[in-house]
Amino acid sequence: MAHIDVFKGWADSLRSDIEAYKSLLESSKADDHSRKLAGAALLYLVSRMDLIPDWNEGIGVIDDVMILRVCAQLTQSHDRGALPTQAEISLERMANEADKIVQFLGSSLYDKLKAHAAKLAEQAVKGRSPAQLMEDAAMRKALYSELEDELKRSVPIVVNDPTDAELRLKAYLTHKLQ
C-alpha cells in the first residue's frame, strides 16, 4: 500500500482523534505540556496557515492528520494523566502511526516536522493560544464549534495519482520545514 493511501485512511478517524485531544486538553490530571500539545493539535486543524493549504487537491488535509500523530507522539514523553480509555487508545494509536511518517519522510525531515509541531504549543491561532485554551472554557467551546464546522465541510480525500501526490506532499514539507 502506498504511503499516501495510509495517510488518507487516517482521515477516517478524524472525529475520534479530535475527541481524544479534547479529553486531553480538558484533563486536570495531565501536565501542562501535554495539554498545550493537545490545544496545538486542535488549533492546527482550524489554522489557515498550515504547512499544506487545505485546498491542495489530494494532499491538503494530509498535513493535518500528520500533525495530530506527531503531537500524540510528543505527548508520550509527558504525563497525560488518567484519560478516558477511548482517548488513551486513540492517542497511543496516533503516536504509533507517526512511525509511518518517519518511514515516508526519513528521519531528518521528520525531525523538522516534529520540531515544528512542538513549537505549535506556544503559538496562537485566531487569537487563541494552547495555554489560553487550557484555562478558558469559552475559548474551548468556540474552537470545538469551529472543529465541528470543519468536520461537516470535509470531503473524502481523492488521490488519482499516488506517486504524484507523494511527490507533492514531500516537496511541500521539504520546502516549508527548511
Residues of each region from the PLM?
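Intrinsically disordered, low-complexity, charge-dense segments enriched in Lys/Arg
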Residues: 95-178
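Membrane-inserting effector segments that mediate pore formation, membrane fusion
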Residues: 41-68
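Membrane-interface alpha-helices
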Residues: 58-89
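Conserved GTPase G-domain substructure that encodes guanine base recognition and part of the catalytic core
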Residues: 10, 72, 152
